[in-house]
């Protein structure tokens, strides 16, 4: 691959920095949300700045279907699959369909991922029968397919390397596969003892790129991105399907048993863990990182926030419904004269159909919207817009109020 072309791809679409030994920048670019959690490290952070209040830019309903995935966005196009097997490219400006693909006897429960290489303009997505497809971004033509033996529950992660972009994808057949982006050919496969339901995330370290999988086998797996060899496996509270969020030497995630953990992957040990609440409400939301805080949704109908350093609870905000969708952190400012200027805030949606923007430091409500239909997946932020898809088949798009 041409070195200049790869460098441009890195700058435009990924959170990677020039030197592989440096930590991953923890924010998606302001004009794109290229994968499920926005960044290679799974931080759920956007570099965008939104001005509140938001207002509906458009919404579009699709009959006899539901959405369970986070939209991904680049170059003014939204890519999103539904649970009844239609994968669509929609215009960010107005929701108009640019192309669509119908899978036979399959659905799309997880987010797609958009190629960071303009010379290989593909969007990658897995379905609930275990098939991973690569579509031409512009036309929807299928470029290649790769088959696994289990549902693809977590969105693929696209990792730029000196040898080309790699597709990392986990399957409920217990495997993590590394594929060549251009043709889908497998480069390595790593299997664990139980299902993989999360998206792989990546930390760039002095020892090389490390891939993290939080598995249904009750372990966090640390895997060498170049070879697929396991570097460590750390026992956790129990099974989990949530995607870890990585920063520095730590990854953060919750479990089905209701515990929340920070794992030091260099030491291969827990840095801290919170005990499950008395109700043992599971975490199916993936965490987002905001400065020194970790923000996550809970099945206990709340948004919870912990100090990244020691796990101390910072704040907890009750919600009307379960929060299985993952928060997105973005800087926001308000229109009031007393507004202190841009501050990090979390965009969160619940199963009762409520979308809120909460101050990341305090949990204070900054904005809210009642969509009616519930949400099982989180939002995407790009180009000044917030896009989220509901269980009732509606795609919503919000922008700064005129």
Q: Language model features by range: what are they?
A:
Residues 7-16:
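Bacterial N-terminal signal peptides
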Residues 18-21, 27:
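Boundary at the C-terminal end of the N-terminal hydrophobic targeting segment
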Residues 28-30, 37-40, 52, 59-72, ...:
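Extracytoplasmic beta-rich repeat domains
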Residues 77-79, 88, 122-124, 166-168, ...:
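Conserved beta-propeller blade signature
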Residues 82, 127, 171-172, 215-216, ...:
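Structural signature of WD-repeat beta-propellers
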Residues 82-93:
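Beta-propeller domains
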Residues 91-94, 136-139, 180-183, 224-228, ...:
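Short loop/turn segments that connect beta-strands within beta-propeller blades
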């Amino acid at each position: 691959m041409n070195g200049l072309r790869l460098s441009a791809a890195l700058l435009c679409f990924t959170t990677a920095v020039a030197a592989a030994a440096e930590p991953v920048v923890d924010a998606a670019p302001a004009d794109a949300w290229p994968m499920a959690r926005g960044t290679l490290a799974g931080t759920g952070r956007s570099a965008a700045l939104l001005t509140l209040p938001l207002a509906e830019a458009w919404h579009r309903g699709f009959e006899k279907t539901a959405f369970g995935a986070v939209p991904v966005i680049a170059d003014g196009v939204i890519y999103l699959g539904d649970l009844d097997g239609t994968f669509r490219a929609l215009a960010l400006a107005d929701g108009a369909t640019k192309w669509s693909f119908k899978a036979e006897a399959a659905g799309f429960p997880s987010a797609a991922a958009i190629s960071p290489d303009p010379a290989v303009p593909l969007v990658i997505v897995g379905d609930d029968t275990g098939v991973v497809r690569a579509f031409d971004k512009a036309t929807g033509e299928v470029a290649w397919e790769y088959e696994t033996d289990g549902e693809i529950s977590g969105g693929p992660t696209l990792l730029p390397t000196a040898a080309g972009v790699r597709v990392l994808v986990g399957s409920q057949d217990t495997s993590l596969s590394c594929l060549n982006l251009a043709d889908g050919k497998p480069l390595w496969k790593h299997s664990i003892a139980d299902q993989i339901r999360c998206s792989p995330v990546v930390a760039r370290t002095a020892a090389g790129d490390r891939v993290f999988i939080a598995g249904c086998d009750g372990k966090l797996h640390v895997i060498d991105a170049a070879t697929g060899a396991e570097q460590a496996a750390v026992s956790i509270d129990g099974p989990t399907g949530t995607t870890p969020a990585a920063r520095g030497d730590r990854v953060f995630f919750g479990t089905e048993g209701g515990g929340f953990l920070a794992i030091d992957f260099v030491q291969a040990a827990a840095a801290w863990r919170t005990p499950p609440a008395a109700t043992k409400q599971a975490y199916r939301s993936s965490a987002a990182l905001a400065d020194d805080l970790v923000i996550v949704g809970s099945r206990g109908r709340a948004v919870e926030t912990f100090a990244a350093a020691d796990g101390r609870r910072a704040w907890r905000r009750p919600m009307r419904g379960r929060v299985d969708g993952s928060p997105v952190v973005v800087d926001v400012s308000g229109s009031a004269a007393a507004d202190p200027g841009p501050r990090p805030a979390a965009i969160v949606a619940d199963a009762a159909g409520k979308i809120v923007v909460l101050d990341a430091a305090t949990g204070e409500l900054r904005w809210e919207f009642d969509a009616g239909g519930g949400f099982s997946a989180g939002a995407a932020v790009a180009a000044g817009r917030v896009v989220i898809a509901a269980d009732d088949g509606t795609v919503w798009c919000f922008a700064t109020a005129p």
